[in-house]
Regions:
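A structural signal for short, well-ordered beta-strand segments and their strand-loop junctions
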Residues: 1, 43-47, 106
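Beta-rich strand-turn-strand
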Residues: 1-2, 6-10
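Anionic group-transfer/hydrolysis microenvironments
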Residues: 3-4, 47, 51, 110
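Short, active-site-adjacent cap segments at secondary-structure transitions
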Residues: 6, 53-55, 113-115
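A glycine- and Lys/Arg-enriched "phosphate-lid" helix/loop adjacent to the NTP-binding pocket
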Residues: 9-28, 36-88, 135-139
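NTP-dependent small-molecule kinase module
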Residues: 88-91, 95-164
Length: 164
C-alpha cells in the first residue's frame, strides 16, 4: 500500500526526507503527471479517506486479533500519535499535486466494502472499455446419471472445519 506520494506524507511527517527532497517532489510530481497524461496515459489518483475514529477502531482490531496483528507495524504505532500532522501533510500534498490533468479523487473509506465498490465504479466510469458481459445462460436439465459406488465417508480423510 505504498506509493511515491509517501514522500509528501509518511516521509515528510516521520522525517525520512529532507526539506529539499520534499520541495523537489512537490515541483516534479505535477510535471511528471502532466507528461504521463500528454503521453496518453489515463492517470487516476484515489485517496481513501478514513476518519480518526475508524482508524482507531482498525488499530484496536489488529491488536485484539492475533491473526491480524502482523498488519500493525511499530511505524503505525508511532504515526498514530501524529494524526493531525498526517492530515496537514495530506492537505499540502493535495495542494501541490491536485492538478486539472490528474486530480485526486477522495473515497470515503470508513466502510471498506462500499469504498472499494464506489472506487471501482468510479474508475470504470473514467476509463473507456467495452462491455463484455456474456449472454445469459440457462441450464438444461441434467440427464439421469447411472448409479455411482462411492467409498464410505469414514474411509476418507477430511480437513477439519475449524471455521464453520
Amino acid at each position: 500500500d505504498r506509493s511515491w506520494y509517501n514522500r509528501a506524507g509518511v516521509e515528510r511527517v516521520m522525517g525520512f526526507c529532507s526539506e529539499a527532497e520534499l520541495r523537489e517532489f512537490e515541483q516534479s510530481c505535477p510535471e511528471f503527471e502532466r507528461m504521463l497524461v500528454r503521453s496518453g496515459i489515463v492517470l487516476l489518483k484515489y485517496w481513501f479517506s478514513v476518519s480518526d475514529a475508524e482508524q482507531e477502531e482498525r488499530f484496536q482490531a489488529r491488536i485484539d486479533d492475533p491473526t491480524r496483528r502482523w498488519k500493525l507495524s511499530p511505524m503505525d504505532l508511532q504515526a498514530r500519535d501524529r494524526w493531525a500532522e498526517f492530515s496537514q501533510a495530506k492537505d499540502a500534498m493535495f495542494a501541490h499535486t491536485n492538478i486539472p490533468e490528474a486530480p485526486w479523487f477522495t473515497v470515503q473509506a470508513d466502510d471498506k466494502r462500499r469504498a472499494r465498490l464506489n472506487c471501482i465504479r468510479h474508475l470504470l466510469s473514467k476509463v473507456p472499455y467495452e462491455d463484455m458481459t456474456p449472454p445469459a445462460v440457462t441450464l438444461a436439465p441434467r440427464p439421469p446419471a447411472p448409479p455411482v459406488q462411492r467409498p464410505p465417508i469414514n474411509e476418507q480423510f477430511f480437513v477439519p472445519n475449524a471455521y464453520p
